[in-house]
Amino acid sequence: MFTDHPSYKADVQRATDVADIGRLSGKTVLVTGATGLIGVHLIDTLMQLGNVNVIATGRSAASARARIGSHYASPRFRFAEHDACLPFDESLTADYIIPLASNTHPLAYSQHPVETATVNVLGAKHALDLAVRCHATVLYPSTVEVYGNARGEDVFTEDYTGTLNLSTARSCYTESKRCAEALCLSYAAQYGVEVKTARLSRVFGPTMLPTDTKASSQFLTRAVRGEDIVLKSEGTQLYSYTYVTDAVAAMLHIMMHGENATAYNISNRECDVRLKDFAQTAADCAGTHVVFDLPTETERRGYSIAQRAILDNRRLLATGFRPAYTMREAVERTIEILSYLRK
């Protein structure tokens, strides 16, 4: 379990401290997509508080037991096997809802575009329907992808609108996330649902799934194995990245302190780097090298064509939140924790 490692325990404690989530005491938080990169860390953080009830859902009970099974003995924790494309049971209630269930890696966009689109749209709708019934607050986890492609050197503020190529396989993810955000605002306007949106940059960390095909995850996986880091492009793309601990802390901070019907970018300007620099950092930490290779056609179809995707985080910083980790620190911690778990 991740919680066995002292650095991960420190990360979880950092997330609880930075997020300032004392007002969650005695409340129930529902998290869908509980076994994913963010879901695992989020649940570990909520359970660390000691006075928050957590309902976690996912499609695989076996995966849940393997990744968040340390909480099963707690009376404050419950896991329910559930498909996010289906409505929630009428008996379910919660004070806060965080619908994380989503396909978030390129191979899924290429091989399962229909499922990628439907889980984003239907998952958001069913979460919002539950919020109407329970008078719950929704924190919707969105993505930098909703901005489309930047014009020149532009940085994405929350009101930015870029261009998007609908003819690519990847549009199943970006357009369905845009639709889900529109649903959030529609439910806020029509039904009075309290909803805040967290637009995440590219998130990485030790809780990533072994099947994750994002470039950053592949770099880190190979680093943990002591292998050379394979870069399948020139690596000149400039992106915002966020360590998973900072992402979880920011999400909870937005949920508790953000304004209703408002979107907040989650990024860390210390982690705005080119893809080749991320690869080199992973190689340096692992004592290996960066090598270049060509992607397969299936891989290429799911790749982002964006050359620049930098999130402006000033709106988030104005709420008092501050990220904690540099790129080097985050990569080192990820490799350290994953190396321990491989033993």
Predicted features, each with a name:
Residues 99, 125-170:
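Conserved Rossmann-fold NAD(P)-dependent oxidoreductase catalytic core, especially the SDR/UDP-sugar
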Residues 1-29:
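Non-catalytic terminal and boundary segments that flank Rossmann-like NAD(P)-dependent oxidoreductase
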Residues 81-119, 130:
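NAD(P)H-binding glycine-rich loop region in Rossmannoid oxidoreductase-like domains
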Residues 30-48:
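N-terminal Rossmann NAD(P)H-binding glycine-rich loop of SDR-like oxidoreductase domains
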Residues 1-2, 227-343:
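C-terminal substrate-binding subdomain of Rossmann-fold SDR/epimerase-dehydratase oxidoreductases
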Residues 151-159, 182-239, 244-255, 280-285:
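NAD(P)-dependent short-chain dehydrogenase/reductase
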Residues 51-63:
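Conserved glycine-rich Rossmann-like NAD(P)H-binding loop of the short-chain dehydrogenase/reductase
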